[in-house]
Amino acid sequence: IAVSFAESREQILNIKEKSQNCKIISKIESVKGVENYNEIIEVSDGVMIARGDLSRAVTIEKVPVLQKKFTKIALLKKKFVIAATEMLLSMTENPYPTNAEASDVANAVFDKVDAVMLSEETAIGKYPVDSVIMMRKIIVESEKFLEEEKNLL
């Protein structure tokens, strides 16, 4: 179960109690979710960093920092992490992503997120299949680099 606008430990525990044996993914996309992240991640099975809504809740320059911080904390606590929203947003209208978007996806891979997620790109975009193919290509190249990097050291 993905809990939109997860904002407190109590909210997540209440949902867990009512949905026995379901995994809970807490979507961090509000100021309260940011403020209570540590307590939310403790009782969640994983976290989705929902960058679109998050960028409307906090100033845009904080989103990349929060993504890195939340990813690191979740992985240290052995929780899974999904980076979501606006990963390849320009592909809703264009057949190719921007360089910044490609770097954004690669950096999520380098940070060891468990998944990256497309939204508008595949839901309402003009190039849904191309978006998936491009996302996969970026992930494959990024993972290759991580393997090569191990051999360099």
Stretch-by-stretch model annotation:
Residues 1-153:
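Non-catalytic helical/linker scaffolds that mediate oligomerization, partner binding
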